[in-house]
Amino acid sequence: MNQTSHRKAKKAVIMTAADSVAIALDDLASGDRVKIRSLLQEIVGELKVSDSVPYGHKLSVKPVAKGAEVIKDGEVIGVASQPISPGQHVHIHNIVSLYVPPPRTKAPKARREP
Amino acid sequence: MHFMGYERPDGSVGIRNHVIIIPSVSCGNEMAARIAEQVPGVKPIFNNHSCSRLKTDNDLATRALVGLGANPNAAAALVVGAGCDTVPASEVADGIARTRKPVDYVDIEKDGSYGKAVEKGVAVARALLAQTAALERKSCNIGNLTLGMKCTSSDTTSIIACNPVVGQATDFIIAHGGSAIFTETTELIGATHILTRRAADESVARTLCRRVEEMRQRIKRAKVDILRSQPNPGNMKGGLSTIEEKSLGGIGKAGTTPIKGVLEWGERPRTKGLFFMDGSANTQIVIVGLAAAGAQIMSLSMGGGVCARLRTSTINTAGGGLPVLPIIKTLSNPQSLPEADYFDVYVGGVVEGRETVAEAGKRLINEIIAVASGKMTKLESFTSPFQEVWEFYSIGPLV
């Protein structure tokens, strides 16, 4: 049996057809095949995941250019801070709010090597 | 569409028929408990309003106390106070009396002593119980309902399931001529652009923005700026990336109709439709504010997580929360399925693709009609040795 093809398809849900992201309903790993379904329970697509995407996080279902709007539930939830391709994890590393500067995150302290 | 409710003299309709005891100030809590102990069936509503507060907060407390008594789920009210209170019991009773429901008050100064005030309170409470016990439910239009809303322990499933499901109920009640109120000003900091698009007119949009900015400035005076603190680390861990995305999830529960107006905390809407109420996101304060604004039924939509595992979360109290505001709890996250029994409606099937939002919405609407007609909520059916002391919204410092 083929070693790669029997990986079970994992699930994600897309809120509206206009959306550029789907929400992972399984923990996804790079290389996983994911079935995208709508809220009406129809399978609307399938794609290959290129990052690890935790349960509840977003993955891109269409290419988004740098600076372009990212759409979820038919609404703009931010813009891409770098180009995003289908199957990628979409989160604070590649989208930013249009209204609020990114949250202050504590920069890790420089570690002195012993 | 109809439910079986209690008609009140002011034309409002209750879904419960409680005789409540309202201490006008926290000093009256013990007296209220003493009276309630001797009159089984009456419901005390303990609160934390005390002296050493500024006028703005005394005004907020007065409106809340009157609003709790005026709430259609109260058939009658007894107000208790000391006599020296910042919010006099007589003033609260006068406010409630405008609804023409039976109301009376006792205080130590007027009645002569603690013992005499309690003794009279017991007699009044018994009389009010007797006077209201015979009231019967009648068929009433859904349009008489005001639904209060809050979401809590939100996670990524909230936007998929519980909030849009609640949105269906909101739209349904408003379509039948009723009202709905959502609140939590803090949650809108940085996200007013999402909500102002829903405003019925320019003035509503402006008021909304002003309220949010006032809240932000109050927080800044405490030397914290939370503009950049959203979404919080927990939200981000759960997959929310921007404030827009977080707010979008929360608004789902408000359905799709325009926002007719912005209410002060505890203020009753003057017309029907969807309203936003200014105030804190603290669950207890939200519950009191909604009840004081006249909501007879409330929806608490929960994602999941540890909060879902607290049986009475997030309203720890004997006999199911604030007596005048039954709460229907909706659970969203399939990972919290073991806790589903603590909830009135489980909508994890929407997340898993076994049920549509419309189907789950219909189940929630049926539950609302059943609870409005007398079915006990999960929270109402739990007994607990603990009694909540309800917190009132305050904006000034304690002095």
Predicted regions and their residues:
Chain A
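N-terminal small-residue-enriched
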Residues: 2-114
